[in-house]
Amino acid sequence: METLNSYLKIIHFPNGLLVDNIKNYRENYAKFKSKNYSPILKLKIDKTKDNIELRDEVINDFISHISDLINLKSNYVGGIRYILSELFDNIFEHSESEFAFLTFQNYPNLKKIEICISDIGIGILGSYKKTNSSLEKNFSDIITDLDALKSATEGKSTKSVERGFGIHTSRNIISEGFKGYILYQSGNALAINDSIFESNSYIRGVIFVMNIPYDNIDNQFSIYDFLE
């Protein structure tokens, strides 16, 4: 128990390591560069130019940390960067959360890496309801968390301008391209790759967990095969 508590403290569980400026962030993050995990990074959701640039710097450093640990090939780096950028764009645009959270854990013996992104906002259902009330689109048929998660997985976008497919495309990249799995939950709706069902637990906002194996990297993988 003492070891677990020590680990949780090191990764800044449960509150996260606040990313407030690039200098402080890099000083705090430097001690993790040789570790098989990152701290729980806590990014302020603020759509100002400076904060977006800070977010993008953090994502680049985060991916570099993973790549350096497991010698990740450039085609996989591109895929992970696309997924993180797309999910963070969605969180910043729709979640109404004050913060977003990002962390990873490498499992060298299993040759797998897990990446987790979450927020504590209005959730996927709340995002559809907000868009429906604005009369930009009609999502009146989306009533439950399960309805919302199914719609998001199918690529039913809340964006005024269709740009990518968010969860839909990310899921396909991970499950078909990386041969891994993605678990995501919003409210009491839970999805693991193609399976979507009601969960006994309820979470505020959204959580995404990506499990990516790297023991048999597909050199032919290209993110462009999954973009429409």
Range-by-range predicted roles:
Residues 1-65:
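STAS-like cytosolic regulatory interaction modules
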Residues 23-33, 136-143, 150-228:
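Flexible, glycine-/charge-rich segments associated with ATP-binding catalytic modules
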Residues 5-10, 127, 194-195:
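A short acidic (Asp/Glu
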Residues 83, 95, 104-105, 118-120, ...:
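Short His-Asn-centered micro-motif
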Residues 39-72, 132-156, 172:
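Helix-loop-beta hinge of the Bergerat
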Residues 11, 74-109, 167-176:
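Conserved ATP-binding N-box helix of the HATPase_c
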Residues 51-85, 109-126:
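A short mid-domain helix/strand-loop element embedded in enzyme catalytic domains
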Residues 90-133, 195-197:
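ATP-lid-like helix-loop hinge signature
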